[in-house]
Amino acid sequence: MQKNRNTFSWVKEQMTRCISVSMMIYVITRASISNAYPIFAQQSYENPREATGRIVCANCHLANKPVDIEVPQAVLPDTVFEAVVRIPYDMQLKQVLANGKKGGLNVGAVLILPEGFELAPPDRISPEMKEKMGNLSFQSYRPNKKNILVVGPVPGQKYSEIVFPILSPDPATKKEVHFLKYPIYVGGNRGRGQIYPDGSKSNNTVYNASAAGIVSKIVRKEKKGGYEITISDASNGHETVDIIPPGPELLVSEGEYIKLDQPLTSNPNVGGFGQGDAEIVLQDPLRIQGLLFFLASVILAQIFLVLKKKQFEKVQLAEMNF
């Protein structure tokens, strides 16, 4: 009886350990996934826009591609408006995934708004705007930087046009905000990057020879994919092994002489990053009222002038008849 109890206790203890380990693995995995999104820049840079005006996403996405932003010319205080970011690309293109296979391109964007502008709260967004937004999830670049918004990566087939719901500030409640013209900056990428934040290459870029010499051996890795290329220096017999991950296509063959930094592979990258800017005016309602009053007074003055002219013409005509 005692033996059965001990066995039961041992089984219970092992099951508890297994459940605990499984939960830890799940938590760690989920954390790593969430930390990888939406963009690596959040982990490495306090501000996504450098003093030179360059957005840091260009450090990893080396190819230059277009991006477009559309915002209203002017907005009133405490108003929700749309900032539309367009990331165009050929929808037929396929990119190299991390496992070396081909797949659709993803897109992502960072929107740098003026201080005081921020993501509109859900209860202020109209149903029409929510429909345009789709199922996108926006977040602040930092908890203390609500004016910088990021989104992605998301499927490019569905979200090559991204609608940001923005709430304009009210200078009456935010004294640091004024009725002025402000710049808005945007960066948008399509496809994976070529360099990781730690400086290492992804498999979505070209690989060059790290030494000059004869390609003495090419070994194809069967399990993970990719190649091991052995380069032999005929002058001293030194051998250099370059590792090529799965994805890029090999351009060299055994027995071929290659130079230092000569491309060993094709460049599989079909995506790229672009940045742009726009301007928006935070308009004072009193100015609009003043402008309307001025226009109304001008119209009334014109009407009075016309009436006065007609009256004068009638007087002249009466004098001539007399």
From Swiss-Prot:
Secretion signal, residue range per the UniProt entry? 1-36
Which family does the record claim for this protein? Belongs to the cytochrome f family.
Spell out the subunit comment: The 4 large subunits of the cytochrome b6-f complex are cytochrome b6, subunit IV (17 kDa polypeptide, petD), cytochrome f and the Rieske protein, while the 4 small subunits are PetG, PetL, PetM and PetN. The complex functions as a dimer.
Record flagged with keyword Transport: yes
Q: Return the protein name.
A: Cytochrome f
Annotated residues for binding of heme: 37, 57, 60-61
SUPFAM superfamilies to which the protein is assigned, alphabetical: Cytochrome f subunit of the cytochrome b6f complex, transmembrane anchor, Cytochrome f, large domain, Rudiment single hybrid motif
The cofactor remark states: Binds 1 heme group covalently.
Q: Highest lineage ranks of the organism?
A: Eukaryota, Viridiplantae, Streptophyta, Embryophyta, Tracheophyta
Q: What's the chief localization of this chain?
A: plastid
Q: Which InterPro entries match?
A: Cyt-f_TM, Cyt_f, Cyt_f_lg_dom, Cyt_f_lg_dom_sf, Rudment_hybrid_motif
The species this protein belongs to is Nymphaea alba (White water-lily)
Keyword annotations for this protein, in alphabetical order, are: Chloroplast, Electron transport, Heme, Iron, Membrane, Metal-binding, Photosynthesis, Plastid, Signal, Thylakoid, Transmembrane, Transmembrane helix, Transport
**HAMAP family reported for this sequence:** Cytb6_f_cytF (MF_00610)
Membrane topology, record value: Single-pass membrane protein
* Cofactor(s) annotated in UniProt: heme
Q: Which Pfam families does the entry link to?
A: Apocytochr_F_C, Apocytochr_F_N
Give the CC-aspect GO terms.
Answer: chloroplast thylakoid membrane
Q: Where are the transmembrane segments?
A: 288-308
